[in-house]
Amino acid sequence: MLTLTERLPQAAPADATLTLPFEVRQKSRFRATLDDGREVGVMLSRGEILRDGQCLQAGDGTVVRVHAAAEAVSTVRGDDGLALARACYHLGNRHVPLQIGAGFARYLHDHVLDDMLRGLGLEVVSEQAPFEPEPGAYGGGHGHTHSHDHSHQHDPAGHAHEH
């Protein structure tokens, strides 16, 4: 079985492709099937999400390009920047991984979040599309991972949700 162990710093000519959903692209060690049907093991250093177009290399020099799989997402589109900013605020306040693009915001499909945003007057479309969220909130960014089994204080002005 081919084992991919190195992230290449830039795109390179690929010998094969590997299409993965976001859930798997967050992991550093997993088994998968290349798009040509061959089995592959991935053993990378922790801390980075695999991005669409990123290339990985095996010890024998084989290069594999990663593709983001189309998956169930919810997309908020609009020309009203304030409405989109409001949507991003509410989703970010819930620590939802979020893809932000020109005129849209996208998250992994969640009917509860869809209903919340529709309640704010936004149009939400459920669709199949690649999901490439902003990198800051996970994979080396600021996570909110401290334990909540202890007493602590947050400045209410500096922290937007209750514990």
UniProtKB/Swiss-Prot annotation:
GO annotation, cellular component aspect = cytoplasm
Q: Where is the composition biased (Basic and acidic residues)?
A: 146-163
> By its UniProt entry, which Gene3D superfamilies does this protein fall under?
Urease metallochaperone UreE, N-terminal domain, UreE, C-terminal domain
Q: Which CDD domains match?
A: UreE (cd00571)
Question: Residues of the signal sequence?
Answer: none
Where is region (Disordered) located? 130-163
Which SMART domains does this chain map to?
Answer: UreE_N (SM00988)
The cross-references to Pfam families, in alphabetical order and at most eight, read: UreE_C, UreE_N
The compartments listed are: Cytoplasm
> Which InterPro entries is this protein grouped with?
UreE (IPR012406), UreE_C_dom (IPR007864), UreE_N (IPR004029), UreE_N_sf (IPR036118)
> Which domain of life, per UniProt?
Bacteria
Q: Which terms in the Gene Ontology molecular function aspect does this entry carry? A: nickel cation binding; unfolded protein binding
An individual GO BP term: protein-containing complex assembly
Entry keywords, A to Z? Chaperone, Cytoplasm, Nickel, Nickel insertion
* Function (record text): Involved in urease metallocenter assembly. Binds nickel. Probably functions as a nickel donor during metallocenter assembly.
Q: Which family does it belong to?
A: Belongs to the UreE family.
Q: What is the name listed in the Swiss-Prot or TrEMBL entry for this protein?
A: Urease accessory protein UreE
The top of its lineage is: Bacteria, Pseudomonadati, Pseudomonadota, Gammaproteobacteria, Chromatiales
Instruction: Name the gene.
Output: ureE
